[in-house]
Amino acid sequence: MRLSYFHSPDRVPAEGMADAAVAIDVLRATTTMAWALHNGAEAIQAFADLAQLDAAASAWPDDQSLRAGERGGQKLEGFDLGNSPLAVTPERIGGRRIFMSTTNGTRALDRVRSAPMLLTAALVNRSAVAQRLLQHRPEQIWMVGSGWEGAYSLEDSLAAGALADALLEGSGASLLDLAGNDETCAAHALWQQWKDQPEALLRLASHGQRLQRLGDHDADLACCATVDSLTVVPSQDEPGVLRLS
């Protein structure tokens, strides 16, 4: 296995595709996706384009669907949910399909949706995702951070490093053998430095600060910083649709 990290969708190579791709948006899309599927959502259908989301959601019965979305960290007007992992409770989302669009995370998914294996990861499920990859051992794996509007993000790089660390431990490989680019090595070094205080890093990150300025997101930050609290692996079942597999 060779593991490469790209800190935003814009950094993904224009040509070719890896055997497996892992989309990461710790604050907060892929954390919310993991919790939603854990709590019984039928599926999550992700969209970068809001008009496409509206068209798809309108085709589903109201009692079987929910619209979830944010822009700039704030819930979209007229949507049922924003992008908080704490809002996707079993009572709210159980059995329903969530039609979702976020500022950054759904763009990352859209960029690699042609990958033969597409998973989503966050700190909350990094070991479960690592185990899935170790079961299949794809030759080339791309981790794609969501970043913030094309810029680097600390929190996504932390999760990429955490996933790399779990793959190193599970495979017995060296970083020299596993890392496909310098960004993977840098992400792993970031994880080594902050693995004992991930929430502190999320609060240091620019998007963590942005969320704190928008309101009381302490509980969201604590949830997103929890490592290996879930064993779910969201996986693309059909283009743009994530389920548990």
Swiss-Prot record:
Its EC number is 3.1.3.71. One of its GO terms (molecular function) is magnesium ion binding. InterPro entries: ComB-like, ComB-like_sf. It is an enzyme of class 3 (hydrolase). Its cofactor is Mg(2+). It comes from the Bacteria. It catalyses: (2R)-O-phospho-3-sulfolactate + H2O = (2R)-3-sulfolactate + phosphate. Keywords: Hydrolase, Magnesium. Pfam families: 2-ph_phosp. Belongs to the ComB family. This is Probable 2-phosphosulfolactate phosphatase. It comes from Synechococcus sp. (strain RCC307).
